[in-house]
């Protein structure tokens, strides 16, 4: 079987026509016009591109480094302590900002206290009758339970059924009083 294969491969090689080789193309021919003719001066002048200009710019990194040197020098100069142990310029500048922050915090505390006092006074004026009876209304009903109503483990919050019933009864009494007042006015 092996000899038969060798014989078949020899015959196939002999029968195969010899390959026609393509002519070799050069890179300089690919950009030449179709009607290109060689000049008497030879091949040297017309196929070569001009070299790039040698004037290259310095680039961003050069300017960053060139600017960083005086910046670090100035930082060093301003970070040095003053005469007789005085704080340096940067520390003085930061202390000015701290003073502004403290003044802003004091101002915010005063505004918050004024708003809380105004809310307290509003409750005093609105609920003066209830205060005489010893009952003081809440600032807002959600004060009982802050937080999300979802993903809460059982038993985390106190049951508010009695509180809800008190406010429901209060609302119904108020609506009944308004209905009687409207009926009396008609």
From Swiss-Prot:
InterPro entries in the record: Nuo17.8 (IPR034444)
Highest taxon listed in the record's lineage: Eukaryota
Alphabetical UniProt keywords: Membrane, Mitochondrion, Mitochondrion inner membrane, NAD, Oxidoreductase, Transit peptide, Translocase, Transmembrane, Transmembrane helix, Ubiquinone
Membrane topology of this protein: Single-pass membrane protein
Listed GO MF terms: NADH dehydrogenase (ubiquinone) activity
Enzyme class name: translocase
Regions of compositional bias (Basic and acidic residues) in chain numbering: 26-49
Annotated localization: Mitochondrion inner membrane
Catalysis: reaction(s): a ubiquinone + NADH + 5 H(+)(in) = a ubiquinol + NAD(+) + 4 H(+)(out)
Keyword Oxidoreductase: yes
Record-listed E.C. numbers: 7.1.1.2
Quaternary structure (record): Complex I is composed of about 40 different subunits.
Function as written in the Swiss-Prot or TrEMBL entry: Transfer of electrons from NADH to the respiratory chain. The immediate electron acceptor for the enzyme is believed to be ubiquinone.
Name recorded for this polypeptide: NADH-ubiquinone oxidoreductase 17.8 kDa subunit, mitochondrial
Organism, scientific name: Neurospora crassa (strain ATCC 24698 / 74-OR23-1A / CBS 708.71 / DSM 1257 / FGSC 987)
Lineage, uppermost ranks: Eukaryota, Fungi, Dikarya, Ascomycota, Pezizomycotina
């Amino acid at each position: 079987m092996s000899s038969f294969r060798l014989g078949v491969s020899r015959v196939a090689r002999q029968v195969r026509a010899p390959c026609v080789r393509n002519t070799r193309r050069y890179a300089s021919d690919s950009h030449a016009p179709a009607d290109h003719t060689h000049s008497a001066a030879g091949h040297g002048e017309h196929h070569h591109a001009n070299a790039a200009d040698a004037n290259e710019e310095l680039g961003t990194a050069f300017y960053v480094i060139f600017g960083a040197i005086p910046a670090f020098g100035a930082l060093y100069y301003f970070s040095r302590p003053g005469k007789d142990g005085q704080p340096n310029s940067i520390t003085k500048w930061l202390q000015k900002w701290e003073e502004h922050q403290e003044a802003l915090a004091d101002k915010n505390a005063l505004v918050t206290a004024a708003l809380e006092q105004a809310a307290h006074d509003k409750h005093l004026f609105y609920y003066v009758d209830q205060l005489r009876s010893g009952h003081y209304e809440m600032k807002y009903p959600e004060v009982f339970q802050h937080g999300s109503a979802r993903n809460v483990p059982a038993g985390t919050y106190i049951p508010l059924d009695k509180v809800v019933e008190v406010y429901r009864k209060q609302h119904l009494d108020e609506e009944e009083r308004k209905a009687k007042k409207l009926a009396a006015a008609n």
